[in-house]
Curated annotation (Swiss-Prot):
The keyword Transit peptide does not apply. Plays a central role in chromosome condensation, segregation and cell cycle progression. Functions as a homodimer, which is essential for chromosome partition. Involved in negative DNA supercoiling in vivo, and by this means organize and compact chromosomes. May achieve or facilitate chromosome segregation by condensation DNA from both sides of a centrally located replisome during cell division. The hinge domain, which separates the large intramolecular coiled coil regions, allows the homodimerization, forming a V-shaped homodimer. Residues 665-782 are annotated as: Flexible hinge. Residues 138-163, 331-664, 831-1112, 1206-1257 form a coiled coil. The gene is mukB. ATP binds at G34, G35, N36, G37, A38, G39, K40, S41. Belongs to the SMC family. MukB subfamily. One of its GO terms (cellular component) is cytoplasm. This is Chromosome partition protein MukB. Keywords: ATP-binding, Cell cycle, Cell division, Chromosome partition, Coiled coil, Cytoplasm, DNA condensation, DNA-binding, Nucleotide-binding. It comes from Klebsiella pneumoniae. Its main location: cytoplasm.
Length: 1479
C-alpha cells in the first residue's frame, strides 16, 4: 500500500517574534497553544503563505475583525514580517520518500501601500541531516546570526552535490511542481483553482459552514467531465471549423469577388492609363510629324511671301514717287483752276459793283442838289420864323402887362439896351470909328463885299461841281488802269490809260485768234497725255508680264491671252468639280472610318471573348456554326459528367453509410440492438467477440452466421415476457442464453472445413457457411474494413471532386458560350475592322495628297487665270490707244502750237480785262485831270465859303446897327413911362397877326425840316452805300491784282487738265492702296507665318522633346510589361478608340474603387498611392504587377493549379462551389442529436450521484455534539430536468433551433432553455456561454449539506441552526470530503505511486469541546490527514504534538518562546528537539 506524503516541518525566518523557528509537524494533529498575541495565527499565516504565495488571495484577518473586505490595502501579511529578508519554508516527505523543501522568500516593500515581495522556490535532494534553518541563516558567533539572501541560498545549494534549487517566476509553475511531487492534492492551473484551494483552507482555518464552500460544492466535489465535454467541444469545434470553413469559403467567395473587383478595377485603372499613354504617344508622334510637315510648308510659304513682299514694296515705292509728282501737278492745276475761277468771280463782282457805283453816283448827285435846295429853303423858313418869333415876342413883351405896354419909355429903354448890344458889330467889322450915323455907309460897303464874296463862292462852287465829276471819272479810270496793270502814280495815269486804249484796239484782233490756237493746243496736249498714259500702261503691262512687247504684237498677244483665259476658265471650272468630287470621296472615307472605329471596340470585345473561349476549350472556331456545334458537344459532355458524378456520389454515400454502420460501438450494425440489449439486460454477441483477431474473424463470422448480431442474455425465460408486443426490432432477432463474462462457442456442434464450417444446429438442421472474403466480426476486422473503405472513399472523394470540378467547369464554359452567342456571335466572324481602317487610312492619305496636289495645281491655274485677266484688261485699255502710241510727231506739233500760243499770249488780257478796257475807253481822257489841282480847288472853295460867311455876318451886324440906329436916341426913355390905350389895342391886333404868322412859319419850318431830314438821311444812306461799295470795289481790284491771273477762256482747259490729273492721281492712289493693302496683308501674312513658324518650331521642339522624353518612360513601361507578361492584359485594343478624357475618367473611376478595395492592405495601398504620379506611368505597371503578385500569393496551389490570377479566380469559383457542397454534407453528419446529448448528461449525472453516495458512507459515523451524522444531497434541478426530457422525447418540436446553420449546438441548447424557462433572467450572458454551461452536467445538479441533529432528524446544515462547534465539525467533515474528491479526480493526472499530503487548519479551536476535538482526531487518523489547531492554553489534547507559545519582550526586543510537547497518551512524553528559542 502506498504511504501518504506528510508535511514534516514548518520553518519561519525573520517573522514578527520568530527569527529562525522550525515547527516539526505531527503526522496527525499539531496544536499551537498560547495566549492572545502569542503568534499562533502568524505561524498558520506563514504555512498558508508557503502553500499559496498569491498576494491577490492572501488576507489574514482576525475572526473578530469587523467590516474587513478584500479591498483593504493591508492584507495582514506586511505586519507579520520584520524588516529584511524573510522566509516561510515547508519540509515535506512524499509517498516516494523524497524530501522536498518548498517555500517563499518575503520582503517588505517600502511605501505607504504596505506591499510585500514574494519569491517562491523549491529544493530537491537535500539530505535529511541538514535543517532548513542551517540553510536560511548564517551563524556569525555564539550569540549572532544573519538571514541569507535568496541568491546566497542559491549559491550555497549549488555548491552541494545532488541538491537542486529552483526559483519560480509564476505561481502556476510552483504549484505544478508541488502537485507532481504530491505536496498538494490538485493541480492548480489557474487563478480560479488557486482561489478554490485558498477558500477551502480559509474555511478550515476559521471553521464553520462557509457560504462560499456551500455555494461552490459542485465545483469542489463534482469533477469536470472533460471527456464528455471534450466530445461536445470537439463536435462543436468540428462544426465550428466546418462552419468557419464555410464562412471562410463565403469570405473567399467575397474575396473572389474582391479579387475579381480588384483585378477588374486594376486592369481598368492601369490599362486605361497604359492605352492612354500609347494613344498619346501615337498622337504625339503624329503631331510631331505634322508639325514638321507644317514647319517645312510654312518656311516655303514664308519665302514666297517674302519674295512677293519685295516685289510689291518696289512697285509701291515707284507708285509713291509717281504719286508725289501727280499730287504736285494736280495741286498746281487745282490752284490754277481756283485762281481762274476766283478771278472770274472777282471780275463779275467788280462789274456788278461798278454798275452799282455809277447808279449810286447819279442818285447821289441828284440827292445833293435836292438837299442844297432844301437847305436854302430851310434857312429862309428859319429866318422868317425867327423874325415872326421876334415880332411876337416883342408884342408880347409890350402887352405882357398893361402897365408895361403903356410904358413906352420902358420899351424904348429896352430897345436902347438892345441897340447897345448890337454895337458889337464895331468889333466884328474891325471898325473902331464906327458910329450910328456912319453905319449906313459901312453897311453898303460890307454888303458889296458880301456880294462879291458870294459871287466868288458860287463860281468856285460851280467849278467844284465840275471838278467833282471829273475827279470821280478820274478815280474810275484810275481804278480800271490799276485793275488792268496794277497801281500807278496819279500823274502817270493819263499816259498809261491812253497806251492801254491804243494797244487794246490792236490786240483785240489777236485775242480773237488766240482762242482757236488754245483749243488746238488743248486738244494736242490731251492727246499727248493720253499717249503718255498709254505708254505708262504699256510699261506696267510689260513689267507685269515680265517681257517687252512691241506695239504690233499687242493684238496677237490679246488674242492669245483670251484663248488662255478660256482654257484656264474651263480648267478652273473642272478643277472645282474635281475638288468637290475628291472632297466628297474623302468625306465618304472619313464616314466609313468613323463607322468602323465605332464598330471596332465591339469587334475587339467579341474577339477577346472568342479568344478566351478558345483558351478555355482548346479549340479554334472559324464560324458561328462551329461555335453552336461545340456548344451542343458541351451539353453532351456535361450530361455525361453529371451522370458519372452522381454515380460516384452514390457509391461514396454508400461507403459512408457502411463506415457509419461499422463504427457503431460493440459492432452493432443496428442501433436498435443496443437498446434491446439494455432492455433485456444482455450483451451483444459482437461485444463479446469484439477482441477477436483479424485471422480468427472469418471463422467466427462463418460460425455464427446470421446470428452474429445476437444478444447474449443470462436467462431466456426472463426475456420471453418482454418479447410479447415487441415491434421496434430487426426482422430476425437472435437471443442466446449464456454468461457474458464466461461465454464460449461450445453451444454449437461445428465441423471445420477448408475455408468453411458446417454448423449442426440440430439433428435435422445443418448450416454450411463459407469464410467471408471481408469478415466484419470483431473490432479488428471492422477496423480493417473501415480502413479499406476510407481508402476507397478518399479515391471516390477525389474522383467526385474532380468530376464536380469538371461539371462546374463545363457548366461555366457552357454559360460562357451561351453569353458569347447571345452578345458577340453576330459580329465575331466579320472582317477585321482595324485592317480595313488601316487600308482606309492609307487610301485617305493618298487621297489627301491628291487633293493637296490638285489644290496646288488649281492655285497655279488661278494665278495664271488672274494674270491673264489682268493682262487682257490692261490690253483692253491699251489697244484703243495704239494710234497714239504710234504717233511720233505729236510732241513736235504740241511744241509748234505752243509757240503760236506764246505769240498771242500778250493779248490775253483782252479776254481777261475786256470789260475794264471797254469802260476805260470813253473816260480815259479824264485822266488828264490833276488830282492835286482838285485838292487846291477844294481848299479855295472852302476859303471862299468862309470869307462869304464872315462878310455875311459883318453885313448882318451892320444891318442890325442901322436898323437900331433910332434906338440909340432912347437913352432917356428909361425915365419916361407913359401909356396909350389906343396903342395897346393896336399892339394886341398886331400881336394876334404876329402869332398867326409865327405859327404858319413854324409849321412850314417843321415840315421842311422833316423833309430836309429825310433828304439828309437818303443822302447819308447813299453816301454810305457809295463809300462801302467803293471800298469793296477797291478791295476787289486789289484782290484781282493780287491773284495775278486773267479770267479768260482758260477755265475749261484748266478744269480738263485738273480732271485728267485727278484721274491719274486716283488711279495711282487706287493702285497704291491696293499695293499697300496687299503689302499689309502680305506683312500680316508674313507675321502670321513668322509667328506660326516660331510656334511650330517651339511646338515641334517641345513635341519632339516630349516624344524623346516619353520614349524612355515608355521603354521602361514596355520592359516592365514584357518582363512580367502582362501585355495581354493591358494592351486592350478596344480602348484605343476612346478619347483621352474618357480613358482618364475610366482610370479615375477605377482609382476611386481601388482606394476602397485596398484600404486594408498597407502594401497595395502604398503602391497605389505611389502609382498616382502621372509623370511616372511605369509605377502603375508596378502596381498592376503588385496586384498580380498579391493575388498569386493567395492562390491555393493545392487546389488551384495555375499562376494566372484571372484563371485562378475562375477555378476558385468552381472549387469553392464544390467545397461548399461537401462541407454542407459534412456538417449534417457532424451534428449530434439532442437525444444523445440528453442520454450522455443523464448517465453522467447518475454516475456522479453514485459517487457522492459512496462519499456519504464515510461521513455517516461523524458526530459533533448533537450532530449524529453528516451527508450530501445531490438533486437535479427542475428546470434542467425539464430540458433533458424535452431533449430526449420532444426534440422534434424544436428542430428549428438544432437544424439552423446560424446557431451552434450550444447556442441552440441555450435558446431552447430560454424558450422553456422564459421567467428566468439570463442577464448579459451570451447564448454560447449559457449553452456551454448547459453542456456541463454539474450545472444540472443542486447540492446541499444535511446533518442528523438530535430529535430534529435530517436538517439542512446552516450556521444559524448549529452551534459553533457543530458548525466547525460539519464544515471540517465536508472539507475532508472535498479533499478526498480532489484526490480521486486528480489520480489519473498524477503518478500512481504518489498519494498527496492532506492537511487542514483550525484556528480558535477553543470553540470545540473535548468530544468534538476527539472526533476530529479520529477523522484525521481514519483519513490519514494532518491537522494544525490553534487553541488557547486551556486545551491540551491527549494526542499529537502541542507547542506552547509565549511572546516575551527582552531588552526592547520581542520574541516568541516555544515549547513543544508530545501527546499525553504517548508512552514516553518528552520535549521535542529544537524547542529552544533561537531568537
Amino acid at each position: 500500500m502506498i504511504e501518504r506524503g506528510k508535511f514534516r516541518s514548518l520553518t519561519l525566518v525573520n517573522w514578527n517574534g520568530f527569527f529562525a523557528r522550525t515547527f516539526d509537524l505531527d503526522e496527525l494533529v499539531t496544536t499551537l497553544s498560547g495566549g492572545n498575541g502569542a503568534g499562533k495565527s502568524t505561524t498558520m499565516a506563514a504555512f498558508v503563505t508557503a502553500l499559496i504565495p498569491d498576494l491577490t488571495l492572501l488576507h489574514f484577518r482576525n475572526t473578530t475583525e469587523a467590516g474587513a473586505t478584500s479591498g483593504s490595502r493591508d492584507k495582514g501579511l506586511h505586519g507579520k514580517l520584520r524588516a529584511g529578508v524573510c522566509y516561510s519554508v515547508l519540509d515535506v516527505i512524499n509517498s516516494r520518500h523524497q524530501r522536498v523543501v518548498v517555500g517563499v522568500r518575503l520582503q517588505q516593500v517600502a511605501g505607504r501601500d504596505r506591499k510585500v515581495d514574494i519569491k517562491p522556490f523549491a529544493i530537491q535532494g537535500l539530505p535529511t541531516s541538514i535543517l532548513p534553518t542551517q540553510l536560511l541563516t548564517e551563524t556569525l558567533n555564539d550569540r549572532q546570526a544573519r538571514v541569507v539572501s535568496l541568491n546566497e541560498l542559491k549559491d550555497k545549494l549549488e555548491a552541494m552535490e545532488g541538491v537542486q534549487f529552483k526559483q519560480f517566476n509564476s505561481i502556476t509553475e510552483y504549484h505544478s511542481l508541488m502537485f507532481d511531487l504530491g505536496v498538494v492534492a490538485r493541480r492548480l492551473r489557474s487563478a480560479s483553482d488557486r482561489s478554490k484551494y485558498y477558500r477551502l483552507i480559509e474555511a478550515s482555518l476559521y471553521g464553520g459552514i462557509s457560504s462560499t464552500i456551500t455555494r461552490s460544492l459542485r465545483d469542489y466535489l463534482l469533477p469536470e467531465n472533460s471527456g464528455v465535454r471534450k466530445a461536445f467541444q470537439d463536435m462543436e469545434a468540428a462544426l465550428r471549423e466546418n462552419r468557419m470553413t464555410l464562412e471562410a469559403i463565403r469570405v473567399t467567395q467575397s474575396d473572389r469577388d474582391l479579387f475579381k473587383h480588384l483585378i477588374s478595377e486594376a486592369t481598368n485603372y492601369v490599362a486605361a492609363d497604359y492605352m492612354r499613354h500609347a494613344n498619346e504617344r501615337r498622337i504625339h508622334l503624329d503631331k510631331a510629324l505634322e508639325y514638321r510637315r507644317d514647319l517645312f510648308t510654312s518656311r516655303s510659304q514664308l519665302a514666297a511671301e517674302q519674295y512677293k513682299h519685295v516685289d510689291m514694296a518696289r512697285e509701291l515705292q515707284e507708285h509713291n514717287g509717281a504719286e508725289g509728282d501727280l499730287e504736285a501737278d494736280y495741286q498746281a492745276a487745282s490752284d490754277h483752276l481756283n485762281l481762274v475761277q476766283t478771278a472770274l468771280r472777282q471780275q463779275e463782282k467788280i462789274e456788278r459793283y461798278e454798275a452799282d457805283l455809277d447808279e449810286l453816283q447819279i442818285r447821289l448827285e441828284e440827292q445833293n442838289e435836292v438837299v442844297a435846295e432844301a437847305v436854302d429853303r430851310q434857312e429862309e423858313n428859319e429866318a422868317r420864323a425867327e423874325a415872326a418869333e421876334l415880332e411876337v415876342d416883342e408884342l408880347k413883351s409890350q402887352l405882357a402887362d398893361y402897365q408895361q405896354a403903356l410904358d413906352v419909355q420902358q420899351t424904348r429903354a429896352i430897345q436902347y439896351n438892345q441897340a447897345l448890344q448890337r454895337w458889337s458889330a464895331k468889333a466884328l467889322c474891325h471898325l473902331p470909328d464906327l458910329t450910328p450915323e456912319s453905319a449906313d455907309e459901312w453897311l453898303e460897303t460890307f454888303q458889296a463885299k458880301e456880294q462879291e464874296a458870294t459871287e466868288k463862292m458860287l463860281s468856285l462852287e460851280q467849278k467844284m461841281s465840275v471838278a467833282n465829276r471829273a475827279h470821280s471819272q478820274f478815280e474810275q479810270a484810275y481804278q480800271l488802269v490799276a485793275a488792268i496793270n496794277g497801281p500807278w502814280r496819279a500823274n502817270e495815269a493819263w499816259d498809261v490809260a491812253r497806251e492801254f486804249v491804243r494797244d487794246g484796239v490792236n490786240q483785240r484782233h489777236q485775242a480773237e485768234q488766240a482762242q482757236g490756237v488754245r483749243s488746238r493746243l488743248n486738244e494736242l496736249e490731251q492727246r499727248l497725255r493720253e499717249q503718255q498714259d498709254a505708254e505708262r500702261q504699256l510699261a506696267e503691262f510689260c513689267k507685269r508680264q515680265g517681257k517687252r512687247y512691241d506695239i504690233d504684237d499687242l493684238e496677237t498677244l490679246h488674242q492669245e491671252l483670251e484663248a488662255r483665259i478660256a482654257s484656264l476658265a474651263d480648267s478652273v471650272s473642272n478643277a472645282q468639280e474635281q475638288r468637290m468630287a475628291l472632297r466628297q470621296e474623302l468625306e465618304q472615307l472619313q464616314s466609313r472610318t468613323q463607322t468602323l472605329m465605332r464598330r471596332a471596340p465591339v469587334w475587339l470585345a467579341a474577339q477577346n471573348s472568342l479568344n478566351q473561349l478558345c483558351e478555355q476549350s482548346g479549340e479554334q472556331f472559324a464560324s458561328g456554326q462551329e461555335v453552336t456545334e461545340y456548344l451542343q458537344q458541351l451539353l453532351e459532355r456535361e450530361r455525361e459528367a453529371i451522370v458519372e458524378r452522381d454515380e460516384v456520389g452514390r457509391r461514396k454515400r454508400a461507403i459512408d453509410e457502411e463506415i457509419e454502420r461499422l463504427s457503431q460501438p460493440g459492432g452493432s450494425e443496428d442501433p436498435r440492438l443496443n437498446a434491446l440489449a439494455e432492455r433485456f439486460g444482455g450483451v451483444l454477441l459482437s461485444e463479446i467477440y469484439d477482441d477477436v483477431s483479424l485471422d480468427d474473424a472469418p471463422y467466427f463470422s462463418a460460425l455464427y452466421g446470421p446470428s452474429r448480431h445476437a444478444i447474449v442474455v443470462p436467462d431466456l425465460s426472463r426475456v420471453a415476457e418482454q418479447l410479447e408486443g415487441l415491434e421496434d426490432c430487426p426482422e430476425d432477432l437472435y437471443l442466446i442464453e449464456g454468461d457474458p463474462q464466461s461465454f464460449d462457442d461450445s453451444v454449437f456442434s461445428v465441423d471445420e472445413l477448408e475455408k468453411a464450417v458446417v454448423v449442426k444446429i440440430a439433428d435435422i438442421q445443418w448450416r454450411y457457411s463459407r469464410f467471408p472474403a471481408l469478415p466484419l466480426f470483431g473490432r479488428a476486422a471492422r477496423e480493417n474494413r473501415i480502413e479499406t473503405l476510407h481508402a476507397e472513399r478518399e479515391s471516390l472523394s477525389e474522383r467526385f471532386g474532380t468530376l464536380s470540378f469538371d461539371v462546374q467547369k463545363t457548366q461555366r464554359l457552357h454559360q460562357a458560350f451561351s453569353r458569347f452567342i447571345e452578345q458577340h456571335l453576330a459580329v465575331t466572324f466579320e472582317d477585321d475592322p482595324e485592317e480595313e481602317i488601316r487600308k482606309l487610312k492609307q487610301a485617305r492619305g493618298e487621297l489627301e495628297r491628291t487633293v493637296s496636289a490638285h489644290e496646288s495645281d488649281n492655285q497655279q491655274n488661278r494665278v495664271q487665270y488672274e494674270q491673264a485677266k489682268e493682262g487682257v484688261t490692261a490690253l483692253n485699255r491699251i489697244l484703243p490707244r495704239l494710234n497714239l502710241l504710234a504717233d511720233d510727231t505729236l510732241a513736235d506739233r504740241v511744241d509748234e502750237i505752243q509757240e503760236r500760243l506764246d505769240e498771242t499770249q500778250e493779248a490775253r488780257f483782252i479776254q481777261q480785262y475786256g470789260n475794264e478796257l471797254a469802260k476805260l475807253e470813253p473816260i480815259f481822257r479824264c485822266c488828264r485831270a490833276n488830282p492835286e489841282q482838285f485838292e487846291q480847288l477844294k481848299e479855295d472853295y472852302a476859303y471862299a465859303q468862309q470869307t462869304q460867311r464872315d462878310a455875311r455876318q459883318q453885313a448882318f451886324a451892320l444891318a442890325e446897327v442901322v436898323q437900331r440906329r433910332a434906338h440909340f436916341s432912347y437913352s432917356d426913355s428909361a425915365e419916361m413911362l407913359s401909356g396909350n390905350s389906343d396903342l395897346n389895342e393896336k399892339l394886341r391886333q398886331r400881336l394876334e397877326q404876329a402869332e398867326s404868322e409865327r405859327s404858319r412859319a413854324r409849321d412850314a419850318m417843321r415840315a421842311h425840316a422833316a423833309q430836309l431830314s429825310q433828304y439828309n438821311q437818303v443822302l447819308a444812306s447813299l453816301k454810305s452805300s457809295y463809300d462801302t461799295k467803293k471800298e469793296l470795289l477797291n478791295d476787289l481790284y486789289k484782290e484781282l491784282q493780287d491773284i495775278g491771273v486773267r479770267a479768260d477762256a482758260g477755265k475749261k482747259r484748266a478744269r480738263a487738265r485738273r480732271h485728267e490729273l485727278h484721274m491719274q492721281l486716283s488711279n495711282n492712289r487706287s493702285r497704291r492702296n491696293q499695293l499697300e493693302k496687299a503689302l499689309t496683308f502680305c506683312e500680316a501674312e508674313m507675321d502670321n507665318l513668322t509667328r506660326k513658324l516660331r510656334k511650330l518650331e517651339r511646338d515641334y521642339c517641345e513635341m519632339r522633346e516630349q516624344v524623346v522624353t516619353a520614349k524612355a518612360g515608355w521603354c521602361a513601361v514596355m520592359r516592365l510589361v514584357k518582363d512580367n507578361g502582362v501585355e495581354r492584359r493591358l494592351h486592350r485594343r478596344e480602348l484605343a478608340y476612346l478619347s483621352a478624357d474618357e480613358l482618364r475618367s475610366m482610370s479615375d473611376k477605377a482609382l476611386g474603387a481601388l482606394r476602397l478595395a485596398v484600404a486594408d492592405n498597407e502594401h497595395l495601398r502604398d503602391v497605389l498611392r505611389i502609382s498616382e504620379d502621372p509623370k511616372r506611368p511605369e509605377r502603375k505597371i508596378q502596381f498592376f504587377v503588385a496586384v498580380y503578385q498579391h493575388l498569386r500569393e493567395r492562390i491555393r496551389q493545392d487546389i488551384i493549379r495555375t499562376d494566372d490570377p484571372v484563371e485562378a479566380i475562375e477555378q476558385m469559383e468552381i472549387e469553392l462551389s464544390r467545397l461548399t457542397e461537401e462541407l454542407t454534407n459534412r456538417e449534417q453528419k457532424l451534428a449530434i442529436s439532442s437525444r444523445s446529448v440528453a442520454n450522455i448528461i443523464r448517465k453522467t449525472i447518475q454516475r456522479e450521484q453514485n459517487r457522492i453516495r459512496m462519499l456519504n458512507q464515510g461521513l455517516q459515523s461523524v458526530s459533533f455534539g448533537q450532530v449524529n451524522s453528516v451527508r450530501l444531497n445531490v438533486n437535479v434541478r427542475e428546470t434542467h430536468s425539464m430540458l433533458l426530457d424535452v431533449l430526449s422525447e420532444q426534440h422534434e418540436q424544436h428542430q428549428d433551433l438544432f437544424n439552423s446553420n446560424r446557431l451552434t449546438f450550444s447556442e441552440a441548447l441555450a435558446k431552447l432553455y430560454q424558450r422553456l424557462n422564459p421567467q428566468i433572467d439570463m442577464g448579459q450572458r451570451t447564448p454560447q456561454t449559457i449553452g456551454e454551461e448547459l453542456l456541463d452536467y454539474r450545472n444540472y445538479l443542486e447540492m446541499e449539506v444535511e446533518v442528523n441533529r438530535g430529535s430534529d432528524g435530517w436538517l439542512r446544515a446552516e450556521s444559524g441552526a448549529l452551534s459553533t462547534g457543530e458548525a466547525i465539525g460539519t464544515g471540517m467533515s465536508i472539507l475532508v470530503m472535498v479533499v478526498q474528491s480532489w484526490e480521486d479526480e486528480s489520480r489519473r493526472l498524477r503518478g500512481k505511486d504518489i498519494s498527496p499530503c492532506r492537511l487542514l487548519f483550525l484556528d480558535e479551536a477553543a470553540r470545540l469541546d473535548a468530544r468534538s476535538i476527539a472526533t476530529l482526531f479520529e477523522l484525521c487518523e481514519r483519513l490519514e490527514m494532518q491537522l494544525i489547531i490553534a487553541a488557547p492554553e486551556n486545551i491540551s489534547p491527549e494526542k499529537g504534538t502541542t507547542y506552547k507559545l509565549v511572546r516575551k519582550v527582552f531588552n526592547n526586543h520581542e520574541h516568541v518562546h516555544v515549547v513543544g510537547l508530545r501527546g499525553f497518551d504517548a508512552p514516553l512524553p518528552e520535549a521535542l528537539p529544537g524547542t529552544a528559542d533561537a531568537s
